[in-house]
């Protein structure tokens, strides 16, 4: 970390500590999420930014927050298959659950949000413009204010590998899949294949307890208790703090502000509910100036000093982020002294870059997080005492270097644009004037 930015790194870490220790868990649409928005809005106003806050409705349990529902549906379906009259109902119910699970939890579609309870969340953003108000492009620094429910299977303090959580949930998922397959087998075979139906129906009471027990593991994936939810020091108070601090850095150092550039500090709500804040933002501002010639640098979880990485896409969402920005981050991480900068595809879920990418905005996500399962990711143990101000400062260093590279690209574009000048009128020679003058009357 460069010494000139140390005081900014210290302030960023103070914001992280305030968010995690004083405000605490900030579930999507919760009062604490709103408190954090108000804290950051006050800070933006204190810088003299042009601040706006936009409300939107969110169904916290319609996406990842609703995973336990899949387990309960699996349990209900497994029990219903003990009764011939309920075969078809169980099959249809389980299939409907899978349609919702794939669309809402895996693909982050909003199609079924109307089926769930809603809360109010917010997007808060502040604009820093050049002194003359003239700009050609926008650099938008985004992060999410909310935190995740506590993932009970991985929230362990023992030496047991937290990846065991995936084994437990995987076993549960297999049980729900088997229950669904048996439901359709029993429903159809009772009419077309009596022997198969008799065999499965007689064996089912033996299998049923195992299916119920396995499905129960899925219900334990998230703890709905807000008090035990993640305090979100890493994920994502770090991103929010750094987005603000970068903006403050340029406000206090106008000589280092990129020329003809607008800086926006965007605090997205409800990311943990399926990217609902960033989705709401790009939908609201579709076709508007704020998304034109815009570079979105999404900052998410910058805490693990050995795992600085640029996220080049979301596998489940089928998105690939801007290659030019990816290259800039790779170069900037090396310049900042990071020995092994990472370049990864987000293997599960999604990040706020995805809605921006789908809206046609150049975007990439920057992180410093161990990409494998840990006992602090989305758990009660995501606290600020786990990482250092040095790591946050290194992240700040990288971001500032990337912004310098973006500015260089935009400056180059302006210099390449030819300036049209009016054609000069050639001066007339005395001979031409004499020749064109009318003859005087005698």
State the predicted function of each range.
Residues 1-32, 37-51, 62-66, 128, ...:
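N-terminal hydrophobic or amphipathic helices/low-complexity stretches enriched
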Residues 66-107:
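Core alpha-helical transmembrane segments of integral membrane proteins
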Residues 25, 32, 55, 304-419:
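Active-site-adjacent substrate-binding region
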Residues 90, 94-125, 134, 147-152, ...:
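Acidic/histidine-rich catalytic neighborhood of metal-dependent amide-processing enzymes
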Residues 423-442:
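Long, low-complexity, intrinsically disordered segments
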Residues 35, 43-46, 50-62, 69, ...:
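Acidic/His- and Gly-rich active-site-bordering loop/insert found
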Residues 2-5, 23-31, 112, 155, ...:
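Second-shell loop/turn segments in exported
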Residues 66-82, 168-187:
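Canonical alpha-helical transmembrane segments of integral membrane proteins
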């Amino acid at each position: 970390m460069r010494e000139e930015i140390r005081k900014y790194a210290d302030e960023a870490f103070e914001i992280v500590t305030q968010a995690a220790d004083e405000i605490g868990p900030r579930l999507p649409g919760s009062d604490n999420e709103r408190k954090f928005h108000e804290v950051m809005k006050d800070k933006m106003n204190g810088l003299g930014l042009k601040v706006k806050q936009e409300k939107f409705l969110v169904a916290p349990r319609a996406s990842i927050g609703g995973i336990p529902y899949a387990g309960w549906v699996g349990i209900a379906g497994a029990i219903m298959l003990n009764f011939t009259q309920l075969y078809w109902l169980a099959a249809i119910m389980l299939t409907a659950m899978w349609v919702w699970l794939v669309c809402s939890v895996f693909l982050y579609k909003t199609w079924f949000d109307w089926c769930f309870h809603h809360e109010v969340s917010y997007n808060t953003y502040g604009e820093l413009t050049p002194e003359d108000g003239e700009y050609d492009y926008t650099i938008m620094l985004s992060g999410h204010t909310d935190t995740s429910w506590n993932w009970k299977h991985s929230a362990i303090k023992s030496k047991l590998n937290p990846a065991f959580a995936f084994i437990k949930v995987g076993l549960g998922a297999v049980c729900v899949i088997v229950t669904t397959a048996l439901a359709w087998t029993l429903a159809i075979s009772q009419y077309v294949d009596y022997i198969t139906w008799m065999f499965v129906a007689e064996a089912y009471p033996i299998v049923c307890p195992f299916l119920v027990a396995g499905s129960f593991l899925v219900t334990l994936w998230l703890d709905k208790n807000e008090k035990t939810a993640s305090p979100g020091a890493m994920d994502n108070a770090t991103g929010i703090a750094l987005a603000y601090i970068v903006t403050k850095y340029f406000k206090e150092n106008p000589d280092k502000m990129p020329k003809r550039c607008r800086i926006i500090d965007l605090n997205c709500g409800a990311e943990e509910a399926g990217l609902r804040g960033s989705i709401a933002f790009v939908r609201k501002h579709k076709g508007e100036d704020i998304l034109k010639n815009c570079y979105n640098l999404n900052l998410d979880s910058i805490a693990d000093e050995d795992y600085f990485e640029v996220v080049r896409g979301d596998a489940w969402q089928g998105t690939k982020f801007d290659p030019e920005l990816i290259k800039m981050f790779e170069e900037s991480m090396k310049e900042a002294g990071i020995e092994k900068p990472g370049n990864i595809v987000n293997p599960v879920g999604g990040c706020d870059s995805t809605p921006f990418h789908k809206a046609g905005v150049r975007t990439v996500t920057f992180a410093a997080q161990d990409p494998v399962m840990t006992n602090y990711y989305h758990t009660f143990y995501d606290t600020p005492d786990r990482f250092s101000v040095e790591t946050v400062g290194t992240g700040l260093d990288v971001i500032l270097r990337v912004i310098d590279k973006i500015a260089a690209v935009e400056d180059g574009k302006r210099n390449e644009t030819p300036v049209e000048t009016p054609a000069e009128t050639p001066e007339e020679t005395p001979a031409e004037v004499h020749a064109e003058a009318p003859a005087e009357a005698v």
